[in-house]
Amino acid sequence: RPPGFTPFR
């Protein structure tokens, strides 16, 4: 995952 990856956003 890349930094700042947010699947909950």
Swiss-Prot record:
GO terms for cellular component: extracellular region. GO terms for biological process: defense response. It is found in: Secreted. Keywords: Amphibian defense peptide, Bradykinin receptor impairing toxin, G-protein coupled receptor impairing toxin, Hydroxylation, Secreted, Toxin. One of its GO terms (molecular function) is toxin activity. Expressed by the skin glands. The modification 4-hydroxyproline is found at residue 3. Its main location: secreted. Belongs to the bradykinin-related peptide family. Thr6-bradykinin: Induces relaxation of rat smooth muscle from tail artery and contraction of that from ileum, urinary bladder and uterus. Binds to both bradykinin receptor B1 (BDKRB1) and B2 (BDKRB2). This is [Thr6]-bradykinin. It comes from Physalaemus nattereri (Cuyaba dwarf frog). The lineage of its organism: Eukaryota, Metazoa, Chordata, Craniata, Vertebrata.
